[in-house]
């Protein structure tokens, strides 16, 4: 059974984020995530605090942070504090980094740093002593436990890393074919580490637009494949063409560039190169019946959580339709 989540772009008023979070929990969404890009948008952790005190059961986290944007001990302290505030409802979503670093002219971090950061955060949140930068430290007050860790990735190496260290993996598209391709590497990483792949949770994250008007629906979400293209550009510089599926890479050939000041923005010129075919594969567009059909395809591909990037407008209506018509049909 697929569980449902939402992700906010933190450019909304805090009061609106609280309102939508409460509505989402009421409508059956079990997770509330938020982007972490502190220059482009508001800082996520105060907003997660508001989300925590205004919900009862919803699990919460950043989707995603990275090892380079904050000292690892700060990330651990933030999560451990929020775990106490929320009653142990925090998760950690983490990747190598994109907009929060690139907007400052920095590059994504290494997988070695990602792995080390995850272990540091786990240990500190569990109250264990560690040696950090040659100094023994311990957060003795951290008593709410380790947050589950979701690792974001696209390429074989990052996906194997997710299988090695993650409680879950974050895949930013809703294409069952690409998800199956990704999961083979997650499985390899898990098996190489002696872990049970079947226990690793799988998130498909993408925007949706429920409408019979496909032209409007596609235009509302066209920004998303453009966002994904930033990661694809990085991939094609690291791998040989035959190592990557053309369904993931071919669409960027007409990409002219990307302006992070219009990151994840409806109607952005960043998305001018994105075709309808790519939109239809990467996102969920169309009437309720089509949404349900696509979600069942994702579940068959191995997805355990579908995470709606709730930032395309008419957010209340999307939550209402999903809560009343889509989620019940998928459970």
Model-predicted segments: where are they?
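N-terminal beta1-alpha1-beta2 module of alpha/beta enzyme domains
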Residues: 1-63, 147
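Active-site mouth loops of central-metabolism enzymes
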Residues: 2-15, 65-73, 143-154, 208-211, ...
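Hydrophobic faces of well-ordered beta-strands that scaffold small-molecule active sites
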Residues: 4-8, 32-34, 59-63, 90-94, ...
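Short, acidic/polar
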Residues: 12-24, 78, 153-161, 221, ...
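Conserved, mostly hydrophobic/aromatic
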Residues: 28, 51, 82, 121, ...
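Glycine-rich, proline-tolerant flexible connector loops at the mouths of alpha/beta enzymes
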Residues: 31-54, 66, 98-101, 173-176, ...
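Alpha-helix-loop-beta-strand connector modules within alpha/beta enzyme cores
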Residues: 45-65, 124, 192, 320-331
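An alpha-helical appendage that flanks or caps ligand/catalytic pockets
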Residues: 107-139, 179, 184-300
